[in-house]
Amino acid sequence: MDYDAFAIAWEAAWNSHDLDRILGHYAEDVVFRSQKAMRLVGHGELHGKAALCAYWSRALEAQPDLSFIVVDVLHGHGMMVITYRNQRDVLAAETLRFGADGLVVEASACHKP
């Protein structure tokens, strides 16, 4: 898998605010973890693309100026880490694990406080 190309497509999808485009990178049974989800949905672990769609829809609504700039891409075995900055210059990292079909099956987001 070309992780650098994935990161470029991931950044472009997020910056488009097109949920279908964003979710196109994720498997139906994806597991997503983020402390930021606690504020919007009451828990930090989401299961399935529908739950992720509901969360990200609320997140995009709450931050209409949301944008990401990829800082670095770290390659692993069947996984990667994308470090990026958002529109407020907050550093974050997302660890993505991929299934055999190239879709994200597990994702964890961490943010600078």
Language-model-detected regions and their locations in the chain:
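Short N-terminal micro-motifs specific to bacterial/archaeal maturation
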Residues: 13, 42-43, 95
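Hydrophobic alpha-helical segments, principally membrane-spanning helices and signal/leader peptides
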Residues: 1-3, 13, 33, 63, ...
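A solvent-exposed, acidic/Ser-Thr-rich amphipathic alpha-helical stretch
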Residues: 19-21, 27-71
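Short acidic-aromatic low-complexity motifs
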Residues: 1-29
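General secondary-structure edge motif
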Residues: 2-3, 32, 39, 76
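Hydrophobic pocket/interface hotspot
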Residues: 10, 22-23, 30, 48, ...
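A beta-strand edge to alpha-helix "cap/lid" segment located at domain peripheries
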Residues: 53, 57-113
